[in-house]
Structures are given as C-alpha cells and as structure tokens.
Amino acid sequence: MIIKENSDKQTQIYNFLIEFTKSKGYPPSVREICQAVSLKSTSTVHGHLKRLEKKGLIYRDPTKPRALEIVELSNEEKELIDIPIVGKVTAGMPILATENIEDMFQIPINYVKHNNDLFILKVTGDSMIEAGILDGDLAIIEQKNVATNGDIVVALIENEATIKRFFKENGFIRLQPENKNYEPIIVEDCSILGKLVGIYRAY
C-alpha cells in the first residue's frame, strides 16, 4: 500500500494510517509507515506523528509504543458483528456446531467484507509469521470447503486444524508454512474448513 507522491509527508502518513487501519483492523508500525511514504528515518516519522497528535487527529498511548488511535475512525459509528471463536475442530462435525464454539467475539463490520459464515481460530505457534500471522492472533476465517492455489486456509489434518498456504500440485496437496524453519505438509487429500479473510491482533 503506497501513498501517492502528490501530497506532503504528513498528509501521506495520515492517509496511510487510515487506509492501513481500515484494511487490517490495527495500526501500522513505524517501519511500515517509513516504507509506505518513502522515508528512511523512523525519527522523522515519530516527528510527524507528534504533530498529528498535537492537531488532535491521532492519539497515542505512551505506555504502548505501537498503540495508536485515529480519532476520525474512532468517531465513526461502528456496526459490530459477533463471530464465533471455535475452540476445537472435529472430523465429521460441522465447524460451527454448538459444542465447538468457545465464545463470541465482536468486531466492527467494516473490518471484514461480509459476515456470512465467519468463524475465528486463535493462532498458536509461529509457522506463518512471514505472512504476518503471529502467535496469539485471532484468525478470521470464511467457512468454505474449496481453495485456490495460494490461498491461506484452515485445513483439517488428522483431526487437527492447521493454518497454512494451500497448493494443489501433481496429484497431491501441499500445505506450505510461511516460516523457513518449517517443512511443508504433503498429503493426498485433506478437508478445507475455510479461507483466511482477516487477522485481529490486540496490542
């Protein structure tokens, strides 16, 4: 996500903050801001953020370095949807069976494209860190049983759900981690439970 060069850096940064936060559901890091607006110095970005805060456009929590709130977005009326958090996945049982659901989680509806057949799995482990999916994240999944090569999916392998990138090739399915320290999972077949459509991360 790169901001056009036809505005000053402060405006570019503010526009990027809004775009990124609307898209991801959480604010960008200072380094991500640097990359988006072609600045090399993180201290320059911090200076712009201070000026935006003085103007009342953003609010930063001094106790949490990455915690940043965009006042404009906070003031928008947010329609919330409830998404079930699935604690376990069992072969032969519908993913949203009552006994599988641990809790419900509310998120603004604008964080996802729709609220049809969504569920949440809590990410455990670091096998997908190079795709920006971290341990403890809440993975928002659209329930579906088919996938296209390159999709990040939830697959059921030996009665255990795993989040990996999907590839079908040479009569086999490759479930590819996004971490060079992990080997791909190669299987003849597997059950696809859904496709990743969003990540929610608390700071």
From Swiss-Prot:
Catalytic activity line of the entry: Hydrolysis of Ala-|-Gly bond in repressor LexA
Subunit text: Homodimer.
Keyword annotations of the record: Autocatalytic cleavage, DNA damage, DNA repair, DNA replication, DNA-binding, Hydrolase, Repressor, SOS response, Transcription, Transcription regulation
Protein function: Represses a number of genes involved in the response to DNA damage (SOS response), including recA and lexA. In the presence of single-stranded DNA, RecA interacts with LexA causing an autocatalytic cleavage which disrupts the DNA-binding part of LexA, leading to derepression of the SOS regulon and eventually DNA repair.
Top-level taxon in the UniProt lineage: Bacteria
Classification via SUPFAM superfamilies: LexA/Signal peptidase, Winged helix' DNA-binding domain
Active site (UniProt): 127 (for autocatalytic cleavage activity), 164 (for autocatalytic cleavage activity)
Enzyme class: hydrolase
Family: Belongs to the peptidase S24 family.
Record-linked InterPro entries: ArsR-like_HTH, LexA, LexA-like, LexA/Signal_pep-like_sf, LexA_DNA-bd_dom, LexA_repressor, Peptidase_S24_LexA, Peptidase_S24_S26A/B/C
EC number: 3.4.21.88
DNA-binding region boundaries: 30-50
Name of the molecule in the record: LexA repressor
UniProt site (Cleavage): 91-92
Taxonomic lineage of the native organism: Bacteria, Bacillati, Bacillota, Clostridia, Eubacteriales
Molecular-function annotations in GO: DNA binding; serine-type endopeptidase activity
An individual GO BP term: DNA replication
PANTHER family named in the record: LEXA REPRESSOR (PTHR33516), LEXA REPRESSOR-RELATED (PTHR33516:SF2)
Gene source species: Clostridium perfringens (strain ATCC 13124 / DSM 756 / JCM 1290 / NCIMB 6125 / NCTC 8237 / Type A)
One Pfam family from the record: LexA_DNA_bind
Disulfide bonds, paired cysteine numbers: none
